Design a protein with these regions (language model features):
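A membrane-interface helix-boundary motif in multi-pass transporters
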Residues: 175-193
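Pair of pore-lining "gating" transmembrane helices in MFS-fold secondary transporters
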Residues: 27-47, 125-129
Length: 219
């Protein structure tokens, strides 16, 4: 990872305006994007670490519980294409809201289908696939709202807040499962999706930051 950087020789593109914010102030500049990245990282790392545990504690065999991750991952890969298409032709924040609503719906449905394998796998495919689409839309919004050095700072900020969400996810989900039993896992997932939707509903957060160059008019 370091080797290519040694060949760059401190190269910097010409003609770029200096950024008007840094990683810390990015929270104030684009809070919706920060929350979206944090929520998705929380969901991803909690799922990788605890989704099979949730399955076993709910009565599934270890083999079936392991398959839960497989179908969740397949959904996360396949459904990015239609989600990206919707993001090109419809309101991107609106698509993010739909992904969040499906995140809540999946959390509600999961405990009721846990013992029916085909329904469980279908639910995980759709639920995790659309929930993962939040990051697709977040990247698209970053490209729409920022240019040049500001885009570089935005993407770097994503890495920081992804790391924070990834650290918090297993801890919060594990605590929820200790307190409320196995269903603490979908409860945490639903709560995180709700937080995302709340931020999407705030008009100020739905608009391009004033410091950024707006590339397209689609909100």
């Amino acid at each position: 990872a370091i080797a290519p950087l040694l060949l760059v020789n401190n190269y910097s593109p010409d003609g770029l305006e200096p950024p008007t914010f840094n990683i810390l102030s990015f929270v104030r500049v684009a809070p919706l994007l920060v929350v979206a990245v944090f929520v998705l990282a929380l969901k991803e790392m909690a799922s990788v670490g605890l989704l099979p545990v949730y399955g076993v504690r709910s009565g599934l065999t270890e083999a079936t519980a392991a398959l839960m991750l497989f179908f969740a991952a397949i959904g996360g890969a396949v459904l990015q294409f239609p989600i990206g298409w919707f993001g090109d032709y419809f309101s991107r924040v609106g698509v993010m809201v739909v992904c969040g609503l499906i995140g809540i719906a999946g959390a509600v449905v999961l405990p009721f289908v846990i013992m029916v394998p085909w329904l469980l796998f279908l639910t995980l495919f759709v639920w995790m696939g659309f929930f993962a689409g939040v990051y697709t839309i977040t990247l698209t919004l970053a490209g729409q709202w920022f240019r040049g050095n500001e885009l570089a700072i935005a993407i770097a900020s994503f890495g920081v807040f992804w790391g924070l969400g990834g650290l918090a996810g297993p801890v919060i989900a594990g605590y929820a499962m200790d307190v409320w039993g196995p269903n603490g896992f979908p409860l945490m997932m639903g709560a995180s999706a709700t937080l995302l939707i709340v931020f999407c509903m705030v008009p100020r957060f739905r608009q391009a930051p004033r410091t950024a160059a707006v590339v397209r008019s689609t909100p």
